[in-house]
Curated annotation (Swiss-Prot):
Zinc finger (TFIIB-type): 8-41
Gene name of the record: TDS4
Organism of derivation: Kluyveromyces lactis (strain ATCC 8585 / CBS 2359 / DSM 70799 / NBRC 1267 / NRRL Y-1140 / WM37) (Yeast)
Protein name stated in the entry: Transcription factor IIIB 70 kDa subunit
Basic and acidic residues composition-biased segments: 295-309
Start and end residues of each stretch annotated as Interaction with TBP: 284-556
GO cellular component terms attached to this protein's record: nucleus; transcription factor TFIIIB complex; transcription preinitiation complex
GO biological process terms, semicolon-separated: transcription preinitiation complex assembly
Positions of region (Interaction with TBP and with the Pol III subunit C34): 98-272
InterPro entries cross-referenced by the UniProt entry: BRF1_TBP-bd_dom, Cyclin-like_dom, Cyclin-like_sf, TFIIB, TFIIB_CS, TFIIB_cyclin, Znf_TFIIB
Gene3D superfamilies associated with the record: 2.20.25.10, Cyclin-like (1.10.472.10), Single helix bin (1.20.5.650)
Described function: General activator of RNA polymerase III transcription. Interacts with TBP. Binds to Pol III subunit C34 and to the TAU135 component of TFIIIC.
A molecular function GO annotation: TBP-class protein binding
Cross-referenced CDD domains: CYCLIN_TFIIIB90_rpt1 (cd20553), CYCLIN_TFIIIB90_rpt2 (cd20554)
Length: 556
């Protein structure tokens, strides 16, 4: 089945005819030229909304809508829910949160778009699942800021999102490893200088301070102070020096508040800059020195701070050792002594490690010296004196003793001991003569004040004392007359295995009676007396003959 139609705006590419026919008998819906039979159109896509009828008679929309930012159409499942709704919802929420954080931190829009692409990659690699969305969003924004070289730091995202900076940093490192981001540029401290200067409110001198701070940062880069340091600490130190150069007093606390580094870190950067050649220049000489900074080359005189630190440590160790037994050059000493090689070759050594290696070295030298004496038969007072001097010089290095704890206080013997303190305390509990306390002395009363206080207390509590005294006198009178209401508690059987004798407790005339019996008749007599006594005390009925109770057990 085919329908004929004429399309004036369409011409056949083969014959130029405008007479076409559409084949609606198959699913391809082809448009064919009637003259030459050329298929000019098939599987045509229309943008009209068409409706169909479901099996239950309901009207349904046929087709799918593809938006401008979608790569696939949105399909509907059997339950009527969107199959791609969850992913699209996650991306939309991420875009909204990225824009909110970017607006709060003044991040440009193009950086936000780049961060959204990083978030899309993280979502495709299943990195978002199981992690806090705030950490992932902050990590994506930080990567985009590092790529675009903006002045934003991790601490800025941490302050805005109220999340731990270490948590964001851990997420950032894992994301960079997951996405294989290996060429992430280092943060330039010059980027943070202008950002920090705006917070200091420098006024008219802000431009001049920024210019001097940037030049100081370039000088520190030439002097090997960039590597291994936080850029915020470098920028804070440069800004502090630039303020001092322009007669603006800014304290360490103000720089710490805007750069988010510790005050010790800031002071350490200043101490490292003090040891450079640029620190010896005056302000005018530093500003006029343009060629050395613009070249950007590190001169041979400038060395990293760690290099000078290790050289000072080596010199300290060499001076502490005995120079008579040291070799002529340090190269020969390093090549012949493996322990000294380990000491001098290490980059960072603590004081305890240095003392440990020196002690090992001294032991080996002592053993070697003893072996040489035993081999050559050398013995004398000079050698004995030399050995004692060597032992004294090796036992104390840098003022520390190898046998004693260098951190133990030396004035502990001046403190009072426990025995001396206890000897001053009197054994008498009421003797307060040895108490030397002005506040306690003010609370102790003399004899007259004590009697006055006693009279006042008796007047206040007189009724209570009279009542207690009357109770005591009444109890004594009752005991003297025998009028007591105390009852003896029933004692438990001391021996449960007694078969020949038993103890029966009955109440006769209000008094307990302990009767020891050996036969059953005596028990019956006691039981009858107890029942009779009970019935006589409490009369249950007038129709009962209480005298007949004596005949219940054969009594007359």
């Amino acid at each position: 089945m085919a329908s004929t139609l004429q399309v004036s705006s369409r011409k056949c590419k083969n014959c130029g005819s405008t007479d076409f026919v559409r084949d609606i008998s198959n699913t391809t819906n082809e448009l064919i030229c009637k003259v030459c039979g050329l298929v000019t159109e098939e599987n045509s896509i229309v943008s009209e909304v068409t409706f169909g009828e479901a099996s239950n008679g309901a009207a349904v929309i046929q087709g799918a809508f593809v938006s401008a930012n979608q790569a696939h159409p949105t399909f509907m499942s059997h339950s009527g829910q969107n199959a791609l709704m969850s992913r699209e919802t996650t991306l939309n929420n991420a875009r909204r949160k990225l824009k909110a954080v970017s607006y709060a931190l003044n991040i440009p829009e193009y950086v936000t778009d780049a961060a959204f692409q990083w978030y899309r990659l993280a979502l495709s690699n299943n990195f978002v699942q199981g992690r806090k969305s705030q950490n992932v969003i902050a990590a994506c924004l930080y990567i985009a800021c590092r790529k675009e070289r903006t002045h934003h730091m991790l601490i800025d995202f941490s302050s805005r999102l109220q999340v731990s900076v270490y948590s964001i940093g851990a997420t950032f490192l894992k994301l960079a490893k997951k996405l294989q981001i290996v060429k992430l540029p280092l943060a330039d401290p010059s980027l943070f200088i202008q950002h920090f200067a705006e917070k200091l409110e420098l006024g008219d001198k802000k431009i001049k301070v920024i210019r001097d701070a940037v030049k100081l940062a370039q000088t520190m880069s030439r002097d090997w102070m960039y590597e291994g340091r936080r850029p915020a600490g470098i920028a804070g130190a440069c800004l502090l020096l630039a303020c001092r150069m322009n007669n603006l007093r800014r304290t360490h606390s103000e720089i710490v508040a805007i750069s988010h580094v510790a005050e010790e870190t800031l002071q350490q950067r200043l101490n490292e800059f003090k040891n450079t050649t640029s620190a010896k220049l005056s302000v005018k000489e530093f500003r006029d020195d343009e060629t050395e900074v613009n070249e950007g080359e590190r001169s041979a005189e400038s060395k990293p701070p760690s290099f000078d630190k290790n050289r000072l440590k080596e010199k300290k160790i060499k001076d502490s050792l005995d120079t008579k037994e040291m070799l002529e050059t340090s190269e020969e000493a390093v090549s012949r002594n493996p322990i000294l090689t380990q000491v001098l070759g290490a980059q960072e050594l603590s004081s305890k490690e240095v003392l440990y290696y020196l002690k090992k070295l001294s032991e080996r030298r002592k053993a070697e010296f003893s072996r040489i004496k035993a081999t050559h038969g050398i013995d004398g007072e000079d050698l004995h004196k030399t050995e004692k001097d060597k032992k004294r010089s090796l036992d104390e290095i840098d003022g520390y003793s190898l046998e004693k704890d260098p951190y133990r206080p030396r004035n502990l013997h001046l403190l009072p001991t426990t025995a001396s303190l206890l000897s001053k305390v009197s054994d008498h509990p009421e003797n307060l003569d040895d108490v030397d306390d002005a506040e306690l002395d003010s609370h102790l009363l003399d004899e007259e004040a004590s009697k006055l206080k006693e009279r006042i207390w008796i007047d206040i509590n007189g009724d209570y004392l009279i009542e207690q005294e009357s109770k005591r006198l009444k109890q004594e009178a009752d005991l003297a007359s025998g009028n007591t209401s105390l009852r003896k508690k029933r004692s438990k059987r001391t021996n449960r295995n007694q078969s020949s004798a038993s103890i029966v407790k009955v109440q006769v005339d209000g008094l307990p009676l302990d009767v020891s019996v050996d036969d059953a008749d005596a028990v019956d007599v006691v039981a009858a007396g107890g029942v009779k006594n009970l019935l006589q005390k409490t009369t249950f009925s007038k129709k009962i003959n209480y005298d007949a109770i004596n005949g219940l057990f054969g009594q007359k």
